[in-house]
């Protein structure tokens, strides 16, 4: 199974890239819009790869961040979610936004993704609510600590996330103080 590909981008479209490796083999790889935004034709890159083997095709999905790849792979395990819907989620929501929406049960955020209606959003929340997003979440550790402290004080997750994004402190104690002022 292919887990990563390193090479030069020879062709780039919004959701696809062609990477030529040192051995001369070129791979066509589907990518999210977030990954696409950070890639340029002609540059050397390494993408984390998820390989999906179907009866009629062998598909490669590439991600610049491992956290985005983990979200994609989690989504593939949800009943009724295929690779194209999982890629639509990765193109519409960043790993942090997705994990917070699932943890908060916020189906409105999930319904913004093309191809996800109310029923699919509820299914995603139900099946992923116990998922371990801590390793996916890319917030710095001081923000995670502040998040957990504020949550233990009874504040709602969505409100905490919004306030923490507005704060400028770079250590746990200062961040909690700043957030409490805004939450009050």
Curated annotation (Swiss-Prot):
Region spans: Domain III: 138-184
SMART domains: HhH1 (SM00278)
Source species, domain of life: Bacteria
Localisation per UniProt entry: Cytoplasm
GO cellular component: a single term: Holliday junction helicase complex
Keywords: Cytoplasm, DNA damage, DNA recombination, DNA repair, DNA-binding
Endpoints of the signal sequence: none
Region (Domain II): 65-137
GO biological process, one term: DNA recombination
Region (Domain I): 1-64
GO molecular function: ATP binding; four-way junction DNA binding; four-way junction helicase activity
Record-linked InterPro entries: DNA_helicase_Holl-junc_RuvA_I, Hlx-hairpin-Hlx_DNA-bd_motif, NA-bd_OB-fold, RuvA, RuvA_2-like, RuvA_C, RuvA_C_sf
Gene3D superfamilies: 5' to 3' exonuclease, C-terminal subdomain, DNA helicase RuvA subunit, C-terminal domain, Nucleic acid-binding proteins
Stretch list, region Flexible linker: 137
Function: The RuvA-RuvB-RuvC complex processes Holliday junction (HJ) DNA during genetic recombination and DNA repair, while the RuvA-RuvB complex plays an important role in the rescue of blocked DNA replication forks via replication fork reversal (RFR). RuvA specifically binds to HJ cruciform DNA, conferring on it an open structure. The RuvB hexamer acts as an ATP-dependent pump, pulling dsDNA into and through the RuvAB complex. HJ branch migration allows RuvC to scan DNA until it finds its consensus sequence, where it cleaves and resolves the cruciform DNA.
Family according to the record: Belongs to the RuvA family.
Assembly with partners or alone: Homotetramer. Forms an RuvA(8)-RuvB(12)-Holliday junction (HJ) complex. HJ DNA is sandwiched between 2 RuvA tetramers; dsDNA enters through RuvA and exits via RuvB. An RuvB hexamer assembles on each DNA strand where it exits the tetramer. Each RuvB hexamer is contacted by two RuvA subunits (via domain III) on 2 adjacent RuvB subunits; this complex drives branch migration. In the full resolvosome a probable DNA-RuvA(4)-RuvB(12)-RuvC(2) complex forms which resolves the HJ.
Record remark on domains: Has three domains with a flexible linker between the domains II and III and assumes an 'L' shape. Domain III is highly mobile and contacts RuvB.
Protein name: Holliday junction branch migration complex subunit RuvA
Protein's organism: Campylobacter fetus subsp. fetus (strain 82-40)
């Amino acid at each position: 199974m292919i887990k990563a590909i390193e090479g030069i981008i020879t062709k780039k479209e919004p959701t696809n890239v062609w990477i030529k490796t040192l051995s001369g083999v070129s791979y066509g790889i589907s990518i999210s819009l977030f990954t696409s935004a950070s890639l340029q034709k002609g540059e050397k890159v390494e993408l984390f790869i998820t390989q999906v083997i179907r009866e009629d095709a062998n598909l490669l999905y590439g991600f610049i961040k491992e956290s985005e790849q983990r979200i994609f792979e989690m989504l593939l395990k949800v009943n009724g979610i295929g690779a194209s819907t999982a890629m639509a989620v990765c193109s519409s929501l960043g790993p942090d936004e997705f994990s917070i929406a699932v943890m908060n049960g916020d189906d409105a955020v999930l319904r913004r993704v093309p191809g996800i209606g109310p029923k699919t959003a509820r299914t995603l929340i139900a099946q992923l609510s116990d998922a371990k997003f801590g390793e996916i979440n890319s917030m710095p550790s001081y923000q995670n600590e502040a998040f957990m402290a504020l949550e233990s004080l009874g504040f709602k997750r969505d409100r905490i996330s919004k306030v923490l994004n507005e704060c400028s402190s770079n250590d746990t104690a200062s961040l909690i103080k700043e957030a409490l002022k805004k939450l009050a």
